[in-house]
Regions:
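Conserved alpha-helical scaffold segments that buttress catalytic/binding sites
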Residues: 1-210
C-alpha cells in the first residue's frame, strides 16, 4: 500500500554501519520484485567480505546482496577505492562477479564528477532503478575523522558534494543511504557530521533540479 501510494518517492536513509545497506536493498527488491536494481557505491572498501566468517557486518553488504541474488555484480559500480584495505581475495571476488571498480586515482584522472556521471549513465542503460550508497569513509581523514575506518588520501568534501549534486539530478536514482558516520569519533568541531549534513543537502538540491 505504501509503495503504491508513494510510487514516485525517493527513499533516503542515514544509517549506522554499512550492514544496513543489505537490509535496505532487500526491502527495495521486495517492493519491486520484477525490477533490476543497480548500485553506485562511493566507498574506500569493496564490502565483499564473506559473512560466513563473522556474520553479517560492516564489510559484507555487497556480497550478501550478490550471493542472495538481489543484485547482479555487473550492476554494481564502486568509485573511491584507495589505500591498502582491499585484500586480493576480495578483489578476486569482485572481478569474478564483474563488479566495476574505479579507484580514486583513476576517478581523479577522468574527473570524479565525470566518473560518477559515467557510472550513472552506464547503470541506467540496464537497470530499472539505482540505489546509491555513500560510505563516509570514502572521504579523506582530514574532513571525515568520525568514521570507523578513516584514511588519508580520500575524496575531498567538494568532490563528494559535486558528485552528490549530479547523483540527485539523475532520474534513475531512486534510493540513497549515507553510512558509517560516527559522531562519537568526530572532532570537537564536528566536521564529519557537518560534512555529512552538507552531503545530504547537496543530494536534495540535485533532486530539486530534476
Amino acid at each position: 500500500e505504501i509503495v503504491d501510494k508513494y510510487s514516485e518517492s525517493i527513499t533516503s536513509m542515514i544509517g549506522g554501519d554499512h550492514s544496513v545497506t543489505a537490509c535496505a536493498v532487500r526491502g527495495v527488491k521486495k517492493a519491486y520484485p520484477s525490477e533490476r536494481i543497480g548500485i553506485l557505491q562511493l566507498d574506500t572498501h569493496l564490502d565483499v567480505r564473506d559473512p560466513a566468517e563473522l556474520g553479517p557486518a560492516n564489510g559484507t553488504p555487497i556480497r550478501q546482496l550478490i550471493d542472495g541474488g538481489f543484485v547482479r555484480g555487473e550492476d554494481i559500480v564502486n568509485i573511491g577505492l584507495h589505500g591498502y584495505f582491499n585484500a586480493k581475495p576480495l578483489i578476486d571476488y569482485a572481478k569474478q562477479h564483474s563488479i566495476q571498480m574505479v579507484t580514486l586515482k583513476n576517478a581523479r584522472k577522468a574527473g570524479v564528477v565525470e566518473s560518477v556521471k559515467a557510472a550513472l549513465s552506464q547503470l541506467s542503460e540496464k537497470v530499472d532503478r539505482i540505489y546509491v550508497t555513500v560510505d563516509m569513509d570514502v572521504l579523506d581523514i582530514s574532513v571525515a575523522p568520525g568514521v570507523p575506518a578513516s584514511t588519508p588520501g580520500g575524496l575531498s568534501a567538494s568532490e563528494l558534494f559535486d558528485s552528490l549534486l549530479e547523483i540527485g539530478k539523475h532520474p534513475s536514482v531512486r534510493h540513497i543511504d549515507f553510512v558509517c558516520l560516527d559522531p562519537s569519533k568526530d572532532s570537537q568541531v564536528a566536521e564529519t557530521t557537518k560534512t555529512g549534513v552538507y552531503a545530504w543537502l547537496q543530494f536534495i538540491t540535485g533532486l530539486r533540479l530534476r
